[in-house]
Amino acid sequence: MATLEDSFLADLDELSDNEAELDENDGDVGKEEEDVDMDMADLETLNYDDLDNVSKLQKSQRYADIMHKVEEALGKDSDGAEKGTVLEDDPEYKLIVDCNQLSVDIENEIVIVHNFIKDKYKLKFQELESLVHHPIDYACVVKKIGNETDLALVDLADLLPSAIIMVVSVTALTTKGSALPEDVLQKVLEACDRALDLDSARKKVLEFVESKMGSIAPNLSAIVGSAVAAKLMGTAGGLSALAKMPACNVQVLGHKRKNLAGFSSATSQSRVGYLEQTEIYQSTPPGLQARAGRLVAAKSTLAARVDATRGDPLGISGKAFREEIRKKIEKWQEPPPARQPKPLPVPDSEPKKRRGGRRLRKMKERYQVTDMRKLANRMAFGTPEESSLGDGLGEGYGMLGQAGSNRLRVSSVPSKLKINAKVAKKLKERQYAGGATTSGLTSSLAFTPVQGIELCNPQQALGLGSGTQSTYFSESGTFSKLKKI
């Protein structure tokens, strides 16, 4: 009898046979599996305790070359972009594009270093990462605190707001962390220094891009300013990428979650990024800032497209867009027009009410008060009325069901509804005469003093014996004489 171990081994043999057949039939799949195995091997050999294995951007040749060019460009003044050249062929624009890509890489590298610091420092103060979200602020706070257990001895006033400092101090008293070993603490401090160096390099790159915005993107700079234009280009990945981006995405570029430390978020601005730092947005009343942000984003996208095609190197279009934005915001702030007094209607201009007619009579007949309702609404003097619940409770019935004078009160027909005598006579004749038909009360026997009972023609009274009947068989009639031809 086979054991459980033998059955497992048999299943593994079958799986190995199937894998061999698949490798023979499809060689590409085998290559992909080898690549995956290589990647997994690299991940296994990666040492997360070593900062150099995690963060490699600062030691790359591309980082060193771009930073060297940026420092040289900041040290000397430049006249701007060369006139008459295509934007993509301009060496200064190429450097700006490289700086934009490098700024994105620096942002990603800061996030990697931030995660490294959090993984190491959570043994000391795990709750700090939920209180301080920004990577640079977190690195500064960690470098300031170190292995200190009493935060009252640490001055964080120049790093965090007073409300956040109070929350951090209270949370540090209840944390379950312990002091870090000396080697781990040195790695954490080194990571903090690297994060700060990356942040200073990013600021230097943005400063260079900002200084060149007047020549590279004059229209965009005229709307949002050079600093915001540089940040937008750096986040989007260049002027061409920014020109292809829709306005709804430009509006949220640079938007970050704000740490309110338990306070209400009802008054915080949502879905606003770098455009919040523009002069137009800051000078707009709070109730109109959301609309102003959408308008600035739309016009900034148009200005970026003009700059990408080098359509207006002087920035006239950008100034026109800015003036249009200003006029629209002023128009929004204007009070609504005063309510005009309503003029009086012209005398006798209203249509007269219809007081008669067939439709109105039918409607009055349909909604007139019935006889039962009239009796229910009428009460006899000195006679109590009956009620639905008895003893005068409930709905009263009035004179319904009471013995009266045994005389039926019939309402007279209104004079307007009566027909005249002539019309009534004609209706009566139609009813009994029936036209040419003989009435059932008419008899063909007549009593005369000469012969007694004799037959008579009942149609003689109607004058039907006329025409040929009166002359053809008449005693006084003569024969017709025909004249021969």
UniProtKB/Swiss-Prot annotation:
Q: Does this entry carry the keyword RNA-binding?
A: yes
Q: Which GO terms describe its molecular function?
A: RNA binding
Q: Which GO terms describe its biological process?
A: cellular response to cold; DNA methylation-dependent constitutive heterochromatin formation; response to cold; RNA splicing; seed germination; spliceosomal tri-snRNP complex assembly
Tell me the InterPro entries matching this sequence: Nop_C (IPR042239), Nop_dom (IPR002687), Nop_dom_sf (IPR036070), NOSIC (IPR012976), Prp31 (IPR027105), Prp31_C (IPR019175)
Which keywords fit this entry according to its UniProt record? Answer: mRNA processing, mRNA splicing, Nucleus, Ribonucleoprotein, RNA-binding, Spliceosome, Stress response
Ranges annotated as biased composition (Pro residues): 334-348
Q: What happens when the gene is disrupted?
A: Developmental defects, semi-dwarf phenotype and reduced growth.
Q: Where is this region: Disordered?
A: 1-36, 329-361
Domain of life assignment: Eukaryota
Motif: Nuclear localization signal; annotated at 352-365
| Regions of compositional bias (Basic residues) in chain numbering | 352-361
The UniProt entry, under Pfam families, shows: Nop (PF01798), Prp31_C (PF09785)
What does the protein in this record do?
Involved in pre-mRNA splicing. Required for the assembly of the U4/U5/U6 tri-snRNP complex, one of the building blocks of the spliceosome. Functions in association with STA1 and ZOP1 in spliceosome dynamics and pre-mRNA splicing. Required for transcriptional regulation and pre-mRNA splicing of cold-responsive genes, such as LTI78/RD29A, KIN2/COR6.6 or COR15A, especially under cold stress. May play a role in stress response. Involved in transcriptional gene silencing of endogenous transposable elements, independently of the RNA-directed DNA methylation (RdDM) pathway.
Query: What subunit structure does UniProt give?
Result: Component of the U4/U6-U5 tri-snRNP complex composed of the U4, U6 and U5 snRNAs and pre-mRNA-splicing factors. Interacts with STA1 and SOP1.
According to UniProt, the name of this protein is: U4/U6 small nuclear ribonucleoprotein Prp31 homolog
Query: Which organism encodes this protein?
Result: Arabidopsis thaliana
